[in-house]
Amino acid sequence: MLVYTVGTFDLLHVGHLALLKYCNTLGDVAVGVASDDVVNSYKPNVPIILLEHRIEMLRALSCVSIVRPYYELEYVTACQELDPDIFIIGEDWGKDKHNIDVENYLKSQGKEIIKVSYNPKTSSTKIKQTVISQLEESEHYHEPILQT
């Protein structure tokens, strides 16, 4: 049984790990990792962690069997190549054309699509916001070391 999921996986955290461990309870796990250009097509900022490093970290996880980047915002090609039995999507999965296309393809192939909920306490965005907030607070309370 092959389980496929996709994402950015920037600042790999316990929420990502929970998702991947869940996928692994269903079968062997294949992960599609969005390239910076793909992420930038729907988010204002590119990932902090380089694509190659995100791939390397995911490959190091024992619950992940296959890691492959994707360079276009479409999932049908990867699903045709990998032939997953199950496709895992997040609760923020929208109704954009690329999402509907892969849903239609998978349904036509008799494949299962499972939607999972995210942990509201853990997200890459929240981690980034915390870091920014702490930096701003630090700069507010401390004089810069170097002055011009």
Language-model features, listed with the residues they occupy:
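Nucleotidyltransferase catalytic core that binds NTPs
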Residues: M1-T148
